[in-house]
């Protein structure tokens, strides 16, 4: 910013603010635009593809205030932080301090990827988490908060689990110290998944400061009421709040107290399993083809977010799982109710996020009207559910609540509207307030009032061509032709033109003042009434939050009922046993593509490890994944795609399926495979579920076979997990002779007339045939290459020299 010309007062003000927010793009409010100057302007014009201009030698660009959210959205999604500088007074108010006084401006908030509140910038069915990681005395903790809903959780962790934690939480922004980000394990994870990173020095994460921040934000004198918090937990929660305070300039919504995320309450899904099982995205990053795309029948935004949270952290408590299953079964068995409930849900807005915007004063009139309609719908839900005298749904009736008085008030005050900006007005019923009614009458009937006054003056002066006109210089004025002089003391001469004479009157000036000021006065009054409505809603904030949670659950669980009815899912038996018995199980995603061959599996304690051999393309990987997915679906409280299912609670799911090169970070496919397998054998328990596909394939035959053999022995003898292994090493089938709880299966294949048919069916036994040349033929290899491969394979089988 080296510019030689004299700096204007406006630029002095801008530069003073910019120096305070150097890491941000500064949106500086000038009238109806947000302006950017100097380097900010050059960068923003390039990124947003908007015109870059110059005033003197100062580069500048701008975006209209009324459409700024779309520009903000693009910048924030690209990882930029934007400081919003607003005018804190009108030019008229500034002039009262002196004719040349500069309008006061200041930054009112900083918009970052993890602190967004605007509905248009948020994905409806995605949580927008801000996350923080700290290390205090070599003890790690992680916390995540969603400003738009108030959700706030924390947990202790360790370096091995941070990648799984981050994938499960999927934050939009990660707050971290300079020292931590230098650690290879953390740095590689942050870069690999392209999380937006905000770095501070280690002093920002000080435990004592964090303690004081927590007490200050929640208005308490001690943290004892939050439980026995460790130093690292205090540091991570307090640092997160300190950052939010800084970005919101102290204007915080009411947040939930931070809740400990109990590892024992939820199934742990490691990072590899989250990727390999394609819970939220396919390996190529697409939503289509993922599990969530196949099971998400939620209608509301908050229901969709709850489903994602549940899928990333399934329950690990049989009682809680069966409570959900009871509700799903209730709706499956009461189809008329289920359909009525689903239809009612279609009119429900995003209660959680609307309520947060109300709390921080950033809601719109259309938000309040949407909330009014939503609370009406929740009353309908209560009426529907209360007809059934059963404990399964009675809890919902209590939590949904009733808002008759609040809804009546909102109905009496609000006009059905889609007004985004409270300062636009036009959303309060005129008859709600006498003064407002008068202002709006003046606005709506100003032409009539002017015409009435014109007719009155025509009668007084007896000049029938008398007109009342308006321009920006004179305002309203009376005009008569030049040959008509008005000799009435009430008519004050203003202007004589060649063909006309213009007058004004005190009565006309008073009416003009009323007309011009009526709109401003009406808007001011509407803003005041709007504020009163917001205060009334905030008084019910805790109950409305409870209602939002109940709506989310009803939506998610009725969506499970829809899934069960539409695709013939069945209720699983979930208990505290070690069972994993699935009859006629199906893959919840693959079966949507057409005919699917169902398969059985029984990982009883006496055969808790299954070893599957067979050719590629026969369906081994699909079978492995389908059983892991069935286990996950059962643990979120959903029915499952099977004829029957009996599943003992799973504490952790591990998956080593499919290639996932990390060459960009210096890791080969084989190294990634070994690292993920090491994580499994170091963490799996006898309550875990493990699927492993083609362990050892990335190295020499003897190395690979030896590693695969020893891994199976370890999981069988030490971890004692329920596990399914798929392998092309047919030698591993000998393990059933020395390990008592292993059983061999293979993929059924039929051959006739030189043709091979993969039946995708699991049968007992093993096979040493890989059918690789047949797969190559299906892939389109030239016949000459296939013939040569056949010839070489025959030589290998006969132990002949390949060079002869």
UniProtKB/Swiss-Prot annotation:
One GO biological process term is: mismatch repair
In this chain, ATP is annotated as bound at 614-621
Protein keywords: ATP-binding, DNA damage, DNA repair, DNA-binding, Nucleotide-binding
For this protein, the record's Pfam families field holds:
MutS_I, MutS_II, MutS_III, MutS_IV, MutS_V
Q: Does the keyword Kinase apply?
A: no
Q: Which InterPro entries match?
A: DNA_mismatch_repair_MutS, DNA_mismatch_repair_MutS-lik_N, DNA_mismatch_repair_MutS/MSH, DNA_mismatch_repair_MutS_C, DNA_mismatch_repair_MutS_clamp, DNA_mismatch_repair_MutS_core, DNA_mismatch_repair_MutS_N, DNA_mismatch_repair_MutS_sf
Please provide, alphabetically and separated by semicolons, the GO molecular function terms listed in this UniProt record: ATP binding; ATP-dependent DNA damage sensor activity; damaged DNA binding; mismatched DNA binding
**Alphabetized SMART domains for the sequence:** MUTSac, MUTSd
Q: Which family does it belong to?
A: Belongs to the DNA mismatch repair MutS family.
**What job does the chain carry out?**
This protein is involved in the repair of mismatches in DNA. It is possible that it carries out the mismatch recognition step. This protein has a weak ATPase activity.
> Which NCBIfam families does the annotation name?
mutS1, PRK05399.1
This protein is called what? DNA mismatch repair protein MutS
Organism, by scientific name, is Ehrlichia canis (strain Jake)
